[in-house]
Amino acid sequence: MASKMPEGSPPTSRSIQSRNSSYSTSSNERIGTPSTISLSENSDLSKLQSTNDFESREDLSLTSDDNNDPEYVMCYNTVYHQKTKINDKLLSETEQLRKIYPLESRVFPKPTIVKEITNERTKRYTFYDDDAPLTNQHTVLDEATYNRILKRIDFFIEKVVEVPPTYHFLSLLNVQLRIQPIWWMDEFAERNGIESLLSALRNLGHYPERASKTPLESQIIQSLFHCLNSENCRRRYQSSAKCSVPGFNALGTIAETVLSKSLNSARMATFLLKFLCNKKGLSYFKAVIRAFEWLVEQKLSKTRFSAWMHSFNDVITGVRVCADSSPQAIVHMDEFEDTDCLIDYLVATLALIRDLCAAPPDLQLRCALRHELLSAGLQKAIDSLLKWRNRHVRDALQLLIKEHNADARRFRSGSDVNNVDRKCVKKQMNYREESHTPHGNTTRKTSTPVSNNRPTTPEQQAVWDVFQRIYTRFTGSEGSKESFIKLLEYFVTEPDNGKIQKSMQLLTHTLEALEGFKTAKADTNVGLTILSQRLLDKLGTAEEIAEYKTKYNGAMLENKHLKEQVESMLSQLNVGPRDPMQFLKKQLDELKAELNLRDNLLASMQREFETRYRAQIQAYNKLQSQMEHVQNSNEQHLQPGLLNKVSKSFDSVHRRNLSQDSLDAMTEQFSYHVEPNILSGSGIPVRVHTPSKTEDLDESFSGSEISSSPSPLLPDVSDTVEEQQKLLLKSPPPPPPAVIVPTPAPAPIPVPPPAPIMGGPPPPPPPPGVAGAGPPPPPPPPPAVSAGGSRYYAPAPQAEPEPKIDETSLTEEQKIQLEEARKQRKAADDAARAAIEKYTSIPSLRDLHKPTRPLKRVHWQRVDPLPGPNVFTKFCLNFDITAKVFIDNGLLDFLDEKFDNTPREDFVAVEISDQRSSLLPDTVEQNMAIILRSVSNMPVEDLVQKFLVEPDFLPASILYFDRASLASTNAYTDPFIPYSTDYTKKNPKEPTADVNSLSYFEKFFVLFVVNLRHYFQERMKALKFRSTLFGDLEILEVRMKEVIDTSDSIMEDKNFAEFFQVLLIIGNYFNEPYDRASAFSLYMIYRLETLRDSSSALTLMHYFDEIIRTRFPELLQAESTFKKIQSVSGYNIDAMVAGVDGAYDEFCDFQTSLKDGALSKCDQHHPDDKAYDILSEWLPEAKERIRNIKKLKTDMLTKLENTVKYLCEYDSIDKVRNSFFKNLNSFYEMYSIAKAENEERFEKEKRRIMSEDRDKLIRGRQKTSIVAKYRNKRELPEDSDDKQDTASKDKNSLETIDEKMEDASKIEGDAKTGDDNEMEDLDKMEDLEKPDYAEEKDPYITVMSELRSRIQNVPKRTVTVYSDEGVATLEPGAQGDDVVDKAKMILEKMEGHSQLLTSSANPDEEVLRAKLKAAERLQKPAIPRTRRKGHTEPKSAKSLLAELTNGSNASNLVENDRQKQ
């Protein structure tokens, strides 16, 4: 597919740095980018990081050096340096291509493109193939090759956006992205390659339909991943990530790939999301969140993260086992070095979760996001991963837990709230410092630094920040920490910025050199200390510092230019609304309008309530003044306890009147008054202070005058909104003061309290002098509103029993007053009930169905409709029928659920504990968790029983349990002895400890390993031998049979032997007599490839192939034998023999174990263990297979020995048998290459000869009579009417034909000869044809039809015709008429008949043959390409007829045809 690059040492960091620094920063040339890119770099897209010269193609780090975490080291050593094993053959080939063409050799500038270049092969790229990689050895690229490259890229993009795409083209694009240079990827991005890949991913559909297109999905996501090496592609990807319109979400399609059943695709999709989420700024974080919300829109997930976490848990627990990710049991499973991309996927997913939870600046939002992830399934995943002891998974998990717990503690303590307040205060202070110039420009005052030891200039501040980040990398050693502190303090006070920048460069280089260390060692710490102490001595000269400053300024300008490009690209993004700010402003205006509408509604409700409330307060104060005046002038004394009781009864009514309905009733009905001086009598005046909750609200009403007339209850209130808010926001009123108890009266009159009316107004006070008289109750407070907007009502208190009144002791006047008071109270009660029933009488569904939970409230404005029809009364619904529909269909329960107003409990941030204790070693428990993860949902007892009854259950576990040596290691089994059962004794004792107290895997280890420890290892070894023996023997058997068949073919194939004999004859011809040989060794046959001809163009193998192909074609049948040799050339004969012998030895050990080993003691086995029975039944079959394979091995070795001797290899037969097949195959490959090159060369030569002949024929043709006829056909004389009459009369006679032919011959003789250039004549002929096409059509057709009719009407006779194939007979026209014979043969030739040759007796045979050949040659060039097919034959027939017959007859025929027109 691609030629291999010249071998050489890999480039050094110095050469890469010099090469990178020489790149042009102009927009026309591409800037090379290394394979390592920082996914959290701070908006510096051109940052070059060549940290490792030997990095692979996929080395993309997940974090930058700025973070103080071990994830940077983890990325370099785990995530991408894991050996990926992909079963797909094409991907395996591209992995090899990636190793052959590493990224470092592809980071070179785009070659110069010129239109005209020289033919020097060193200055041009002439041999570019579509799939060949572009290398940096070519500095000049011709325009044609560059156009081919662009067309190839366009072709790939076309194939990508096809629906559905083709797997073959997607895989080819994947290969190109792995082997082509960076500027090739830049061209791919500029032609919308990234957008095309995202569209192709979208065109695959959604799950579960996409599940059938997993191979296509894998190729597309890999192509997107490999594009990240180009900076242009990264910018395009970042811009496209923000594309989220209805119906399409670019990142949403990638989020769907995270759910893919291919773990390799899910891994790369996670990396792509991680790449964006790690960028600074909330825009990319929001884009990733919208991608997960896209899953909810497509109904792939219930919540944003539930499907993702479910898939993540499936991978951890083994439910989702893929072809490219199934971890097989190996020897060192605890290191996880051979588990494909499983660890990559886990680490990348945990890193993506960390970035998602750390991106929001608001602590509450971060905690809410963490809570959502934990609820979606992250908690289960963490519990499972805590059992894993892989160092990379453990480090990533600990970082996640650490960040989660830190946010949880801050959320509970509320420390971040104070920080936010301080930031807000600081921002306001800075805002106040802004001053406006007279010209309107805003300037900001520069504040002095807080601390004097902090840097004051921006350069020093930048250096200080960098050094702080560097220092955090060396916190493991105290010595290096102290040294770096001193170094930092020195550089803060250093005035020379050049020295500081040079020191920073040295420290950064040291950090890059020490990246590979996992932990700080003693020698490393000492080296860092010495480096920090002697760093100033290693500073460069002033020239070096100036050079560094120049490079630094250039890099800053380049970064600025790239930032401007990013901003322009983002502003030109043609997705979504044209102006995002205008779109957001429109949404904000709509939200403000809705809020204003709600505010106006609340203000109107507040004003309405305020008006009623103040009116009631005024009425109450007036009534209170009246009652005080009456009581002061009253001569009778009331009983002290009655006023207190009446006051309490009024308070109860006050507590009940919390409904807005009662306020409406009181507005209309609460307008009664009390007449003073009704009763006469003497007594001690009593001043009663009624408890009022509104005294603090408005004290001006308490001093109002006493009026004997009713006072208006709705005075004009014109308070502002600000006063109303102050009124409502006042603190709650203080508790009422104590009631002044009057002196006891001589004749107390008990008065019954008012009847308890729910929601009604208070009853009017009785007349003075009557028991129970007192001030009216205060007005009700504002109605209480719950958190969700619905009102709650205070429960009605129990009514006190009405006290009995002895009316016999009352006077007549008192009885009248008591009766009047009762009437007034009854009227007030009736009015209150009417006001309440006005609304409660409206039918409601609550009368039929009681809500099961508190509901939210509908805030509408209630109106009293005027008399007459309206929208609610004209076409009134039947309430009973409508209510039945609601109840029968369950709509009320549905509404109860959807509009539930039950207060929600806020989530609580909890800490996750990673502490665990286990008797089982971490590595063993980790390995068992991986092996048993697909069956971990089964109970332990059932799982152990499954292993005992079905020994073949879970074959992967057999290999692990055989190699792990769990039962033979006392350190593993001794802690579990108290939990185990010993089956070696006849009466096994019960375990002393409870096995149920152990964890899942500990319990399994006890029941399956510890209980069977006396024969467990031999059992698992025998089961492993049984599971692998037949498969190994089958492979050996197939290979040995192929070797035997190939050996027989070599010895029996005659063509194979003669093939080499011809080669021997050619070699002896070349050699001198004393160098001749009767046989040659195959070991040295490769020398034929080095023997070239005199021109060094071809080898002997090329000429040998030409001889075999042309002179001995029957020897080509030996190719079937060579094909067999090619199939067995890769087999190692010694390895096959060793495999048979090893299988026999293992079988002997297995047989011994069954007879005399621990497996033979069945009485000491577990009672449910069926392993021995199954192995005993399998033993005879295994013995027979071993016997057959040993016999087959003997036959193979005998055949090989005879074949080696047959090929004249007599020395060291045991060594030669491993190589002679390879030598024969090498010879056949050389022969095949030479054969293919010969065929290609012959084909090119054939095309060249045909091209030369064609050119020579066109150039060498002379002018013919046909060209003259075509050119001069307009010059033919016009026929007279007599000739027309004669032609019409003689139409059916042969004599007329002869006359016409004679006239045609005369015209031929008078025709002009023309010039010597035939091509010019042909052009003129075509020009003459074009205007007269319509006029010439009918005459030619008339000539042909007339000729056919005349020939058919002539009597038949036989004519002998001689041809190359023999003698034939023809039946032309009349006897003796040779003209008819000639005409018919011409007609047959023009109509596609076979070529005929007339008899040699005919005197015109040679003339006719020559003229027919000339006509045939001229027929093709004379075809006008713009005319209809079939028009040429009639015109050629006319010309031939005029040439081959009498000229006069032909002229007459033409004239007659023209006259007919």
UniProtKB/Swiss-Prot annotation:
Residues covered by the GBD/FH3 domain: 92-508
Function: Involved in controlling polarized cell growth. Required for interphase actin cable formation and microtubule organization.
Subunit relationships: Interacts with rax2, rho3 and tea4. Interacts with tea1 in the presence of tea4.
Composition bias, Pro residues: 731-784
Domain FH2 intervals: 845-1257
GO molecular function, one term: actin filament binding
Polar residues bias locations: 29-53, 438-457, 1445-1454
Family from the record: Belongs to the formin homology family.
Gene: for3
Biased composition range(s): Low complexity: 12-28, 700-718
Key words of the record: Cell cycle, Cell division, Cell shape, Coiled coil, Cytoplasm
UniProt-listed Pfam families: Drf_FH3, FH2
Region ranges (Interaction with tea4): 137-515
Annotated protein name in UniProt: Formin-3
Domain of life: Eukaryota
Species of provenance: Schizosaccharomyces pombe (strain 972 / ATCC 24843)
Record field: compositional bias (Basic and acidic residues): 801-811, 1273-1315, 1325-1337
One GO process term, biological-process aspect: regulation of cell shape
Residue numbers spanned by region Disordered: 1-67, 431-457, 683-811, 1268-1337, 1416-1461
